[in-house]
């Protein structure tokens, strides 16, 4: 018959940045968990998207950042992506300067993003389409407002012997 000695609840509202655009490893991981593709398949798919369809930038990048020059080109790139995928989030704003735009974090290459080229989704295989849309989604996320979340931590002490901790996150505004 233990009783709760102390219950402490901490709440805070946080703004959350969008995920950075993909590098090859992150894209392979995403495609594995979302579509069941193995890393070699993702490499082949991205190679086709890059060379055959001219749909994405250099696909073997180890970097998740973009240059300030990419930020300047964003209105044109976003307009083409929206036309290609026939979807535009209502809050898409090319003036939002995400933390991914940072010349200091660029390595030999930059993040994998869509190109300014016209892409006909009907000419892509299902796998190519899935990967292309994932790349587009992560790129477009850079131009959406930050997500707003309420994070709660509840700590319960039980009879001086045990401490239980529970966490909760509630999305107040999607980013």
What is the meaning of each model-derived region?
Residues 1-175:
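Core catalytic DNA strand-manipulation module of type IA topoisomerases
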